[in-house]
């Protein structure tokens, strides 16, 4: 198995399993973390709370990178009817509000939506997907289009929106409890107390992934924390990791397949939506989450408050 060393993997090690020199860098950068935390906290005050008449659920995390927000949002959509997903649309080549999907019809391009939004759009149980830097406008548009429930992807820090906050707590925790850049936290860890529900893997949800072994496949991925796929590394002939949200080029993928004499790309669905038009044979790594009763019942109780 080969491995492309890059910035994304360096960040994984820096935040979660630092070596001696990375630990030294952490303390050099600590004054910047204090400033970052100050302004992050300041940004959570002095804004009027906006309340909606229908359920708004936020799935977020405090730490940098992916913790499974996308599969958890999908799991909620499988459990409840009429779910629209609203997200920022990170790394998209557009600005403003775009309706990516409405009632099972995809309405824009990958460039306009971004990879995460397009991944949601291919999920049958999700009735609509909207990207917008302004989450309030996105929520309003979703309800206008008939959403029964809005699920916000990565909106824990939007404290001006009245919502049910689910905070994902991964089994793999940052090495230091500092905010960026000396630690992985985007808000001070004490902000966990502002969550309505802290979802712990194993207790509140079960994460599972599957892909068949294929010696003629090259695993390529551009997701945060690629070590989440560790169990699948040995199932492909070679593995290559790219920066989160990386825009794959057809020629470079062709070269990787030729280099290892392979005919198949092994990738996550988030990666697949970016290469599906290239004509490659693809093998999808299934990444799913199943809700356990503790989380499912909390969400049901919250939704029932709007039925009274």
UniProtKB/Swiss-Prot annotation:
Class of enzymatic activity (EC top level): transferase
Pathway assigned in UniProt: Glycolipid biosynthesis; lipid IV(A) biosynthesis; lipid IV(A) from (3R)-3-hydroxytetradecanoyl-[acyl-carrier-protein] and UDP-N-acetyl-alpha-D-glucosamine: step 6/6
Matching InterPro entries: LpxK (IPR003758)
Pfam family, one: LpxK
Bilayer-spanning residue ranges: none
Residue numbers binding ATP: 63-70
Superkingdom as given in the UniProt entry: Bacteria
Signal peptide: none
Reaction catalysis annotation: a lipid A disaccharide + ATP = a lipid IVA + ADP + H(+)
Family: Belongs to the LpxK family.
Annotated function: Transfers the gamma-phosphate of ATP to the 4'-position of a tetraacyldisaccharide 1-phosphate intermediate (termed DS-1-P) to form tetraacyldisaccharide 1,4'-bis-phosphate (lipid IVA).
Protein name, entry field: Tetraacyldisaccharide 4'-kinase
């Amino acid at each position: 198995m080969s491995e492309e060393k890059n910035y994304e993997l360096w960040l994984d090690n820096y935040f979660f399993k630092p070596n001696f020199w990375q630990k030294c860098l952490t303390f050099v950068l600590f004054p910047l973390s204090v400033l970052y935390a100050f302004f992050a906290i300041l940004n959570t005050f002095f804004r009027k709370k906006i309340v909606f008449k229908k359920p708004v659920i936020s799935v977020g995390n405090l730490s940098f990178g992916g913790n499974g927000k996308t599969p958890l949002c999908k799991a909620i959509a499988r459990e409840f009817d009429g779910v629209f997903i609203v997200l920022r649309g990170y790394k998209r080549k557009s600005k403003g509000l775009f309706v990516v999907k409405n009632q099972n019809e995809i309405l824009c391009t990958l460039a306009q939506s971004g990879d995460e939004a397009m991944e949601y759009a291919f999920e049958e149980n999700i009735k609509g997907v909207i990207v917008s830097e302004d989450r309030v406008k996105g929520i309003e548009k979703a309800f206008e289009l008939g959403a029964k429930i809005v699920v916000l992807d990565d909106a824990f820090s939007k404290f001006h929106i009245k919502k049910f906050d689910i905070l994902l707590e991964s089994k793999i925790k940052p090495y230091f409890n500092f905010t960026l850049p000396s630690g992985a936290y985007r808000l001070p860890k004490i902000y966990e107390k502002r969550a309505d529900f802290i979802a712990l893997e194993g207790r509140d949800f079960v994460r599972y992934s599957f892909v068949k072994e294929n010696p003629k496949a090259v695993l390529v991925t551009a997701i945060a924390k690629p070590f989440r796929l560790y169990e699948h590394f040995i199932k492909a002939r070679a593995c290559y990791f790219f920066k989160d949200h990386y825009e794959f080029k057809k020629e470079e993928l062709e070269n990787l397949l030729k280099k290892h004499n392979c005919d198949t790309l092994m990738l996550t669905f988030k990666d697949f939506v970016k290469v599906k038009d290239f004509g490659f044979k693809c093998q999808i790594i299934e990444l799913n989450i199943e809700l356990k009763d503790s989380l499912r019942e909390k969400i049901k109780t919250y939704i029932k408050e709007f039925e009274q």
